[in-house]
Amino acid sequence: ALAALLSDLSERGMLEDTLVVATGEFGRTPFVLKQNPPGRQHWPKCFSSILAGGGIAGGNLYGKTNRKGEYPTRNRVRPEELAATVYHALDIPINDPQDASGLSRLLTTGKPILDLFG
């Protein structure tokens, strides 16, 4: 379904004006736990995200884990950096946005990952 959505947006010339984000707040244990029944649990040390459109350069991977997928080894991304990247793609000011009542609010303390943009 995600591939079809991205294809449709691209074919209609809408992908550059649309940011698609698919993410989760945690991964799964990179090993099968010895429990009954055996299985995997939440693993907060690594998670995956897909960002497409909205100025994001396509066909790239960002970040790397160790061989077992347990821990980030390069370009670790924290949730606040992911949020800042989304706000940047949508041209939403991070440090001084105003809500509908005119109040200024700090949306995130993270910095956008500019290497993701083409």
Model regions and ranges:
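Ligand-binding pockets and gating/stacking loops
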Residues: A1-G118
